[in-house]
Each structure stands twice: as C-alpha cells, then as structure tokens.
C-alpha cells in the first residue's frame, strides 16, 4: 500500500446518517474478483437516475465536490454487512480519508486494512467542520504523523488514532507485509516453542 503521512485534498460532505455498506456498494456489484474498479459503482443507487444519467440531486455529484479525496460523512457510517468491498469502492472512487462522528466497527477496521484513514470526531466539532465545507470547493490537510487536521480557515483540529493502525498507514504496511517484517521474530519464537505433538 502507499504510505499515508500527510494528505491535502478537496473535502466533500455527505451528511446522511446510517449509510450502510449496501448503499456504499450495492450487492449486485459484488461478483467481481478484483479489488479495483468498484469506484464507478460507489453509491450507485443514489448517484444515478433510472436512465443511467448522474442524479444532480445527489450530494457527491455536485460540481464543487469534483475530485474530492476527503469525505465528511454522517453518524454510523459503514453500518450493515461487513463486506470489504465498501472501502474498496470508496478508495477506488478517490477517497483517502473519511471523517465522521462514528463508524461501524468492522468498516472502521477495513478502512485501515485497505490504506484509508477513518477519523472519528466529536459531533459538535464534526458539525462545524461539515458546515464549513457544505457546498464549497475547499481543501483540507490531514497530518497523520502529528494527528492534526488543518481546515480551510487555517484552524487545527486534533484527532485520535490507534498507534497500530497509525504505524500501518504511515509505512504503507498491509497485514502480509507486517507479518514479513516480523518473520525473524516469529521464527525465533517457533524455534523455542515445543511442538504440541511432542509428549
């Protein structure tokens, strides 16, 4: 995975609560075996009209949000089934960071595992931030190393992140590469450990 230390990008607001994984990536698109190419199906039922044209009423179709890489989402984002296709779709759409008051736990972990940074933010702080970026074409900088958000007004907002996931993102590790880094330690442990087959 690509390391994520500091990211600057346009922020888009999707102020809807309880957005579930079926709304993020509908089930009819889960038959693919690749991890890429899901971006065009993200939010499909909201994003497109029945004739296949983009729905101008859907928030993320607004011109001001074109090219956004930071999503300011509503409470309980990513609830529903545990499908890993949801973060795949959001990542392929172009989002690298998601800021919300709360996330479904499995979705939250799946974001980290797929190189995305989900940031939990107290509701009052989130409400101010969402209001600032609502219907605006504004950038934001997220500094993961120092755990700071720099908004469009130059204000700093601190955030919490689990040290394990922080290290994974900053170094671009996935679970396999992290295991390989610990290969010597694992082998040393195994060499000292008696086989359960031994009497």
Swiss-Prot record:
The keyword Ligase does not apply. The keyword Transcription regulation does not apply. Coiled coil: none annotated. SUPFAM superfamilies: LeuD/IlvD-like. It catalyses: (2R,3S)-3-isopropylmalate = (2S)-2-isopropylmalate. It comes from the Bacteria. It is an enzyme of class 4 (lyase). Its EC number is 4.2.1.33. Belongs to the LeuD family. LeuD type 1 subfamily. Catalyzes the isomerization between 2-isopropylmalate and 3-isopropylmalate, via the formation of 2-isopropylmaleate. This is 3-isopropylmalate dehydratase small subunit. The lineage of its organism: Bacteria, Bacillati, Bacillota, Bacilli, Bacillales.
